[in-house]
């Protein structure tokens, strides 16, 4: 709780953000023992890269809220941070129930129109995240999401390498 309430530091090392995500997932494992496993991967050279605080945890939280990971046997969540050409890519994938394609398309349209979804409570986390990265990094930042071909859902956050 102290981590997210510290308003003095808006940028944190990736290592710190991943530690917070790890603590969140440990807490969820205690709540739902034996229901899922998780893995967090980041190359050592990325661990000191600074990113906006609370960038990854809300996406992981969505795996429980929308993917129903706590209700599925053999659930899996994968968090990866890696460089891809000129971008830092942060991705969260799960093997949950995925999402309805019509709802995904509607959300993509709202993001393209920069519609904050006033009065709408669905997917506010992804809309907020998209707005935050665009405000901080400009048009070079990108949030993508969709169902995985093998089932589940994946969210990728692409940040310009020179700024990350």
Where are these regions (language model features)?
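Two-component histidine phosphotransfer core
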Residues: 1-146, 153-154
């Amino acid at each position: 709780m102290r981590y997210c309430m510290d308003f003095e530091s808006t940028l944190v090392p990736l290592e710190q953000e991943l530690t917070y995500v790890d603590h969140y997932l440990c807490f969820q494992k205690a709540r739902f023992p034996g229901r899922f496993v998780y893995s967090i991967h980041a190359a050592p050279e990325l661990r000191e890269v600074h990113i906006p605080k609370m960038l990854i945890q809300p996406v992981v939280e969505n795996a429980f809220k929308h993917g129903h990971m706590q209700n599925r046997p053999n659930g899996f969540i994968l968090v990866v941070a890696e460089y891809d050409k000129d971008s830092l890519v942060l991705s969260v994938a799960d093997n949950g129930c995925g999402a309805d394609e019509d709802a995904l398309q509607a959300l993509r349209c709202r993001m393209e129109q920069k519609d904050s979804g006033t009065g709408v409570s669905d997917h506010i986390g992804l809309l907020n995240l998209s707005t935050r990265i665009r405000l901080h990094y400009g048009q070079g930042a990108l949030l993508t999401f969709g169902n995985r071909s093998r089932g589940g859902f994946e969210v990728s956050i692409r940040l310009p390498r020179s700024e990350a």
